[in-house]
Amino acid sequence: TKLYVALVITAVISTVISLSIIHIQAKKLLLEELHTNVVSIAVNAASEVDPKMIQQVQLNKNVNSLEYTATQNVLRKIRDDNRRENLFVKYIYIIDPAHNKPNQFNYLVDAEEKTSADFSPIGESADEAISADLSGHLKQIYSPANFATDAWGEWMTGYAPIYTSDGKYLVTVGV
């Protein structure tokens, strides 16, 4: 019976270790897939947005301008197209580095309705970019390693830069 108990204990320990390894690997794969999805959506959005319109929004800072509305509509379409059962984009926005304030970003264009409690007007601080260490990855396609937690909840976030036609960094799309 001692041999039988030893074999059962060995089998249980082996099973627990195997299941733990499978769980860790599955979690890692799911996290990688989420990173890939949010980054792909951010890159798609960055390629769809017209940099000249963004430059006009930066100059005018008017949420009622044609350029703002056109850019907002592009973001809304991308957001709405990515609201599916297996992936749900809650927010998509464009943020602008704050002048003379390293590591700080402000909202430039938000896909949310202007009447929504979640709408972020031009110039509002985008604090999630600080916690995501976006300034360290400003000109890169980037997704923080872990879920970000902010006032709106817990998120997987992806960022992609938008460049001018001559290759200069302009702003960043966040998903």
Locations of the language-model features?
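A short beta-strand signature within small-molecule sensing/ligand-binding domains used
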Residues: 142, 152-161
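Amphipathic coiled-coil signal-relay and dimerization helices
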Residues: 20, 101-112
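Short N-terminal helix-loop-first-beta-strand/juxtamembrane motif that initiates sensory/input modules
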Residues: 80-106
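Extracytoplasmic/periplasmic sensor domains and loops in membrane signaling proteins
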Residues: 110-148
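Short amphipathic alpha-helical segments
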Residues: 68-79
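Short, hydrophobic beta-strand elements of compact beta-sandwich sensory domains
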Residues: 158-175
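Extreme N-terminal signal-anchor transmembrane helix of membrane signaling/transducer proteins, especially
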Residues: 1-25
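Juxtamembrane membrane-water interface segments immediately C-terminal to a transmembrane helix
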Residues: 7, 21-47, 62-66
